[in-house]
């Protein structure tokens, strides 16, 4: 795999996650979040000539990192459509699925993408640049209650209603188009000592809404449950409590709500058994080298 001219994304918990896939040389594997290709490259290094890796990413920029390898197929699509493409390629079952749910460093550091409050640019935040709705569309068209719900649910912000009210009032004077426009509206609502943390939560909430991240994750997790062979591994790296809760629930109970199904006799039916009872986190050395790994949590489960 050729190195990108600039570092697209430093893979987090690389060895821990790929080890967790329990790779067999001739297996069929899925990297649901290709990004800079770091995890895919490591997976390919452990496969023989009969194996195959299907890697998904909806961002056209990720295509610049793909590898020319007969054992590799790149699918430019959101991982929520995983079953459609596995069916298309005639794949009846896979041996492991890996998903690193973190936003690539590339996205945060590219001012044109609008993911970070550190740079001026358009308020965009689309992972898929061909998708219709931008963050600017959300803040300019959603009603006050809907905005408040987004900030409360996806950003866990206590002042979500004040935020929504300020946005609606400001857009009545002029449209909020750029990150600068947006910061001008919301910055006064936060104390200086917690400003960066609160702004990060606001931007997280908008990003989740724009990209429908929770809905996509839900669909992918249920699809993975069906796609994995018995003994197959589901390996997921999460970065915030909302997605981690969903992943934990699906692995423990087979249901994102955390309610395990029971058979006629009341016996609990769960599709997975946990490989690691406690989450795996980045060590001090990795956190020092890559601070964005600090919030990463790795969970691994095996299909019964």
From Swiss-Prot:
- Please cite one Gene Ontology biological process associated with this protein: rRNA base methylation
Disulfide connectivity? none
Q: Which InterPro entries match?
A: RsmH (IPR002903), SAM-dep_MeTrfase_MraW_recog (IPR023397), SAM-dependent_MTases_sf (IPR029063)
Per UniProt, which keywords does this protein have?
Answer: Cytoplasm, Methyltransferase, rRNA processing, S-adenosyl-L-methionine, Transferase
Instruction: State the Gene3D superfamilies in the record.
Output: Putative methyltransferase TM0872, insert domain, Vaccinia Virus protein VP39
The cellular location(s) given in this protein's UniProt record come to: Cytoplasm
Q: Name any GO cellular component annotation.
A: cytoplasm
Please list the coiled coil stretches.
Answer: none
Tell me its EC number(s), please: 2.1.1.199
Q: What class of enzyme is it?
A: transferase
Q: Annotated Gene Ontology MF terms? A: rRNA (cytosine-N4-)-methyltransferase activity
Q: Which SUPFAM superfamilies match?
A: Putative methyltransferase TM0872, insert domain, S-adenosyl-L-methionine-dependent methyltransferases
Q: Which residues cross the membrane?
A: none
| Matches recorded under Pfam families | Methyltransf_5
Q: Which HAMAP family match?
A: 16SrRNA_methyltr_H (MF_01007)
The family note in this entry says: Belongs to the methyltransferase superfamily. RsmH family.
Q: What is this protein called?
A: Ribosomal RNA small subunit methyltransferase H
Annotated organism of origin = Phocaeicola vulgatus (strain ATCC 8482 / DSM 1447 / JCM 5826 / CCUG 4940 / NBRC 14291 / NCTC 11154) (Bacteroides vulgatus)
Upper taxonomic lineage:
Bacteria, Pseudomonadati, Bacteroidota, Bacteroidia, Bacteroidales
